């Protein structure tokens, strides 16, 4: 059976108080002895009481004098570093409890004003009876929320993301984590055409793809080569093609009426499920046919100052824009 917890209060009965003193004093001496023996520290105890004229000491008078002299040899800062009496201990506890109470009151007030703010937004302002202090706190909370909203809007604008899009897209774009697609000229088993709707969308694609990268679409697909093998018969003049592409873009922007023909002729071949960044194998007869068609398309386009990217044939090819 467990002993009932003793209430920490002054004992008004003299006999009970004296008996409790003797019992507790003996227990205190025992605890000091155990602490000194188990932990190997130097300790002493001096107890004054109204029932005895001489104080009781532990372990002895000489032992107490030795411990006190060692304590006085320490610097004053070390002496008061962890020294505490009953009054100081109570003050520390009160200060700690007061700080905890202040922090909890602040959090509770913020939650209360947040609830009032959202209730007012949905038209339930009449259910609250707010005074001047409540209105000031509510105004402070509204200002904080507005600052957060404006800061997020500024972040989205700086990252180039339209308002309403996912914030994760803005973060990824600002950090440069969005990979650029690697376009490779190849055949695909499906026939899907995505048509360009406006000149602005085509300009976006033109800025998205490097003009130098468009050179690979102007040649028919060659035979299958290995990952580390490169065809030796492709002698491209990149500088000349880059200048031609610049003239082509300027011609397109100056003559928007040619956009319909341009969108019908332009496309990017998409990779099939091979997942290799090299040109796929095709039959030899099909290669000659593509070469002839692309040559005719290039001759026709040069006469109208427009450079098509691929041939107009869409059989067994995938186009995307």
From Swiss-Prot:
Expressed in the central cell of the female gametophyte and in early endosperm. Also detected in ovaries, young siliques, roots, leaves, stems, young flowers and anthers. Pfam families: SRF-TF. Its main location: nucleus. It is found in: Nucleus. PANTHER family: SERUM RESPONSE FACTOR HOMOLOG (PTHR48019). Residues 89-114 form a coiled coil. It comes from the Eukaryota. One of its GO terms (cellular component) is nucleus. Probable transcription factor. Controls central cell differentiation during female gametophyte development. Required for the expression of DEMETER and DD46, but not for the expression of FIS2. Probable transcription factor that may function in the maintenance of the proper function of the central cell in pollen tube attraction. This is Agamous-like MADS-box protein AGL80. The keyword DNA-binding applies. The lineage of its organism: Eukaryota, Viridiplantae, Streptophyta, Embryophyta, Tracheophyta. Interacts with AGL61 and AGL62. Forms a heterodimer with AGL61. Interacts with MEE14/CBP1. Residues 1-61 form the MADS-box domain. One of its GO terms (biological process) is positive regulation of transcription by RNA polymerase II. Plants lacking AGL80 (mutant fem111) have defects in central cell and endosperm development. The gene is AGL80. Keywords: Coiled coil, DNA-binding, Nucleus, Transcription, Transcription regulation.
């Amino acid at each position: 059976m467990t002993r009932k917890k003793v209430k920490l209060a002054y004992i008004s009965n003299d006999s009970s108080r004296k008996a409790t003193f003797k019992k507790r004093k003996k227990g205190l001496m025992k605890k000091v002895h155990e602490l000194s023996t188990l932990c190997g520290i130097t300790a002493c105890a001096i107890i004054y009481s109204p029932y005895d004229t001489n104080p009781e000491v532990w372990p002895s008078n000489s032992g107490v004098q030795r411990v006190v002299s060692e304590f006085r040899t320490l610097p004053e800062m070390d002496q008061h570093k962890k020294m505490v009496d009953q009054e100081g201990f109570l003050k520390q506890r009160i200060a700690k409890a007061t700080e905890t109470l202040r922090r909890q009151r602040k959090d509770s007030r913020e939650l209360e004003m947040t609830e009032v703010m959202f209730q007012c937004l949905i038209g339930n302002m009449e259910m609250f009876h707010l005074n001047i202090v409540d209105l000031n706190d509510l105004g402070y909370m509204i200002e904080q929320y507005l600052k957060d909203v404006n800061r997020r809007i500024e972040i989205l604008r700086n990252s180039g993301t339209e308002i309403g899009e996912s914030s994760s897209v803005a973060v990824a774009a600002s950090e440069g984590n969005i990979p650029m697609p690697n376009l490779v000229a190849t055949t695909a088993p499906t026939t899907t055409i995505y048509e360009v709707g406006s000149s602005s969308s085509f300009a976006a694609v033109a800025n998205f793809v490097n003009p130098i990268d468009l050179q690979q679409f102007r040649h028919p697909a060659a035979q299958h080569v290995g990952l580390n093998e490169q065809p030796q018969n492709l002698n491209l003049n990149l500088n000349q093609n880059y200048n031609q592409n610049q003239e082509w873009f300027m011609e397109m922007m100056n003559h928007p009426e040619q956009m319909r023909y341009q969108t019908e002729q332009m496309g990017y071949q998409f990779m099939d499920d091979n997942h290799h960044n090299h040109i796929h194998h095709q039959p030899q007869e099909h290669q000659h046919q593509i070469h002839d068609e692309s040559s005719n398309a290039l001759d026709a386009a040069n006469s109208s100052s427009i450079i098509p990217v691929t041939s107009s044939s869409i059989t067994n090819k995938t186009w995307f824009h």
